[in-house]
Amino acid sequence: MTKSELTAKMQENAAYLPGKTVKLDFGGEGTILMDGKNETVTEDAGEADTTIKISWEDWQAMAAGQLDGMTAFMTGKLKVEGDMSNAMQLQGVLSKLR
């Protein structure tokens, strides 16, 4: 799945946290902004309440259920900046994509 396909699937499935903004930062692969305030998912690099830094490959593994979010965090594959509670709620968002 490409980042554009993922963005479209996330928008279609309302894969965002209501009232919150979370940015997925894939480094050189770009970003996805889940804007629960405006109920949109875009490839914008705007400001967010929480920024999740993870490689595109590791994100794909998490989305497929092959990599646990807590394991990714504990091993340094996933880094969180900002409101940690939003990051903790992302499992629910991921379940909308399976």
Language model features: what each stretch is:
Residues 1-98:
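Feature captures hydrophobic
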